[in-house]
Amino acid sequence: MAVTRTFSIIKPDATRRNLTGAVTKMLEDAGLRVVASKRIHMTREQAEGFYAVHKERPFFGELVEFMISGPVVVQVLEGEDAVKRNRDVMGATNPADAAEGTIRKTFAESIEANSVHGSDSDENAATEIAYFFKPEEIVG
């Protein structure tokens, strides 16, 4: 397997409960390395742009409101098959369906407040990383 990068967001429900360290530890324990990280409070424009793919979906407005409701931690993760590895440790979107030991099973409050976002493909990872990070901010 090749070493690749993926993008992760620790969402407001998790940062509000001071879970940034616990979530990051689970990611690192899964073999992912944090090569860039910053805590930000997304603007409405940032959230709408980031989630533009969902603009026509009925949950778009609620998603944007949730993502701007508090600080988030955006991260670039690196490791072998990083997208898949990150998605495996995150667990299913719906925490009720997530496997034991995953981030969402352990920390998510609901399907909406599910603690983390992770890229779903290498292509989307590259786009999402570039949305929040300049190349010089990523230190491998």
Swiss-Prot record:
Gene3D superfamilies: Nucleoside diphosphate kinase-like domain. GO terms for molecular function: ATP binding; metal ion binding; nucleoside diphosphate kinase activity. It comes from the Bacteria. It catalyses: a 2'-deoxyribonucleoside 5'-diphosphate + ATP = a 2'-deoxyribonucleoside 5'-triphosphate + ADP; a ribonucleoside 5'-diphosphate + ATP = a ribonucleoside 5'-triphosphate + ADP. Its cofactor is Mg(2+). It is an enzyme of class 2 (transferase). Its EC number is 2.7.4.6. Its main location: cytoplasm. The keyword Protein biosynthesis does not apply. GO terms for biological process: CTP biosynthetic process; GTP biosynthetic process; UTP biosynthetic process. ATP binds at residues 11, 59, 87, 93, 104, 114. Keywords: ATP-binding, Cytoplasm, Kinase, Magnesium, Metal-binding, Nucleotide metabolism, Nucleotide-binding, Phosphoprotein, Transferase. InterPro entries: NDK-like_dom (IPR034907), NDK-like_dom_sf (IPR036850), Nucleoside_diP_kinase (IPR001564). Pfam families: NDK (PF00334). The active site is at 117 (pros-phosphohistidine intermediate). GO terms for cellular component: cytoplasm. It is found in: Cytoplasm. HAMAP family: NDP_kinase. This is Nucleoside diphosphate kinase. It comes from Sphingopyxis alaskensis (strain DSM 13593 / LMG 18877 / RB2256) (Sphingomonas alaskensis). The gene is ndk.
